[in-house]
Amino acid sequence: MDKYLIKMPTKTNLNGDQKPAALKGTPKTIDKQKEKNTPTEKQKQEDDYVEKENTPKLRNAQIAKPASKRKNQDTPTEVKDIKNEEDGENPPKRRSARLTRSTRSMAEEGTPSPEKEKPEKLPFIKYKGAIKYYTENHEIAASADDVIQWIDKQTTLDVVPMAFDMEWPFSFQTGPGKSSVIQVCVDERCCYVYQLSKLKKLPAALVALLNHPKVRLHGVNIKADFRKLQRDFPEVSADPLIEKCVDLGVWCNEICETGGRWSLERLANFIAKKAMDKSKKVRMSKWHVIPLDENQLMYAAIDVYIGQVIYRDLEQREKVKLQNEANFKEQNGDAAFKAVKALGETFLDKITQVTI
């Protein structure tokens, strides 16, 4: 802070020819009034006032915005220092946001974390496939049996991915209701929606479909869905399903070297470059009421359809990554591979040149 020397008034004696006016008060206050009322003292006070008004400090304060209108009430000198700093070669640095363990490495390299990027305007998902909707026990059993037969015919595949999701009503007064809808997708051209409202017990064929040895169930936060399904329908055992399922968010972090928890909507943005219409009106609707309307059916179908699309994309990325890693090790050795891997290389793209 700059310091300014301000000339203080000096005490002078009254001229003998002048007669001061009669003053009232105690002797102490009268002496003070005498000092203030002298002509010399008044003139010096005026000079001091003018001198103070002309100081650079107050001139800058007059130019700056009033304190009440400034977001940060800086002193005039600080305002001047900030202006000089902005005019210099090095502009003031903004305080960095708090870094989490998952985003620290990317932030240090100056690369934004993909899952933290502001979503761009993406086209909405348009599902044009079939939606097979069933509400009766025997209909659900027959449909599940048809899916099992289709899976058994896929003799060239050791694993058949099947997108899985659930819906249930929710009330702020009573909390989540009983599991009301199960939707699955094994082929992007057809989604199955099973409404469970009339069922006291799940059909054996549906339970067999979920536990099929070739089926790989996948979804987002899918383990919590299985636990809820077991609570609502005890004939379902959650542990075997959890052991063989794939959480798409966790898998994405492993393949793409990202971090944090994912929602299905954000995964669709990041992987499929599509936007999802997550209408609260539909999401919080009465899923237990039969029949479901067109908006509910489309909402349920899109959830598993885009899940299947994301799985296929991640599966392809994993193949490319493993192939690139194998080629790099063969050409450069394990030591170079570990060094490049430590630098954050994902190997999702082919590396043609290495500089360490």
Curated annotation (Swiss-Prot):
Residues that, per the record, bind Mg(2+) 2? 165
Record's superkingdom? Eukaryota
One Pfam assignment = DNA_pol_A_exo1
Any idea where this protein resides? Nucleus
Q: Which GO terms describe its molecular function?
A: 3'-5' exonuclease activity; metal ion binding; nucleic acid binding
Per its UniProt record, what SUPFAM superfamilies does this chain match? Ribonuclease H-like
Provide a GO biological process annotation. Answer: negative regulation of mitotic recombination
The record's CDD domains line, in alphabetical order, gives: WRN_exo (cd06141)
Keywords assigned by UniProt, alphabetized: Exonuclease, Hydrolase, Magnesium, Metal-binding, Nuclease, Nucleus, Phosphoprotein
The 3'-5' exonuclease domain sits at 155-316
Instruction: Give the Enzyme Commission number.
Output: 3.1.11.-
User: Spans of biased composition, class Basic and acidic residues?
Assistant: 29-56, 71-85
Q: Which GO terms describe its cellular component?
A: nucleus
Instruction: Region Disordered: list its residue ranges.
Output: 1-120
Role summary: Has exonuclease activity on both single-stranded and duplex templates bearing overhangs, but not blunt ended duplex DNA, and cleaves in a 3'-5' direction. Essential for the formation of DNA replication focal centers. Has an important role in maintaining genome stability.
Name this polypeptide is given: 3'-5' exonuclease
